[in-house]
A protein has these predicted regions:
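A contiguous binding-surface segment within folded domains or other stable secondary-structure elements
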Residues: 67-71, 77-85, 89-92
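Hydrophobic aliphatic residue packing
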Residues: 11, 34, 52, 98-102, ...
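Divalent metal-dependent phosphate-bond-processing catalytic cores, especially two-metal-ion Mg2+/Mn2+ enzymes
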Residues: 1-6, 19-47, 58, 86-89, ...
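An amphipathic alpha-helix signature
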Residues: 4-12, 35, 74-81, 99
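Short linear motifs at secondary-structure transitions and domain/linker junctions
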Residues: 28-32, 76-78, 92-95, 101-102
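His-Asp-centered metal-binding catalytic motifs of divalent-metal-dependent phosphohydrolases/nucleases
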Residues: 49-67, 72, 76, 97-106
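Residues at secondary-structure transition points
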Residues: 25-29, 52, 67-71, 93, ...
Length: 162
């Protein structure tokens, strides 16, 4: 079994513990959506798509498990380190890269390491494209516009248009 598949099985089991079916569905859709976007972005930029997908699968797990987004990026990085240590899927450098991306993913206005940026951008892609009726968050607009340019998306959506 691939490392990503093993991690997804673990995450699926954790998400399936969420009692509210709408929250459970939302969690699955977001984690898998960000994972797919992270894979695409990492491949385009020449980074490890498997590590990007693994970071994406774990990036909001703490929030889903606890129901709280309070400092969820930092707490999520700690949880990811525990999970990766338990499952023994990554070496130290890979674990550090994944945890750094999760730790920084909520600060969309700051530029961090390349893999951190892959996760931030994947999160923004999922937020902005999963429901076209919702406005792009102001803190995500500049990043989304850059992604539209990078991927040749001509119909850029702005906060003012929606």
């Amino acid at each position: 079994m691939s490392r990503l598949k093993e991690l997804r099985n673990y995450v699926d089991a954790e998400i399936n513990k969420i009692e509210d079916p709408d929250k459970r569905t939302s969690a699955i859709a977001h984690l898998y959506g960000v994972s797919l976007a992270a894979t695409m972005i990492a491949k385009k930029r020449g980074f490890d798509p498997e590590i990007a997908a693994m970071a994406a699968m774990l990036h909001d797990l703490h929030a889903y498990k606890t129901g709280s987004y309070d400092d969820h990026a930092h707490k999520g990085a700690e949880l990811a380190r525990e999970i990766l240590g338990e499952l023994k899927l990554t070496d130290g450098a890979e674990t550090d890269m994944i945890c750094s991306a999760i730790y920084h993913h909520d600060d969309k206005l700051v530029t961090d390491s390349p893999m951190d940026e892959v996760l931030k951008d994947a999160d923004v892609i999922d937020h902005c494209l999963k429901d076209a009726s919702k406005a792009v968050k102001e803190k995500e607009q500049a990043r989304f516009d850059k992604l539209c340019a990078e991927f040749g998306m001509k119909d850029e959506v702005s906060v003012n248009e929606v």
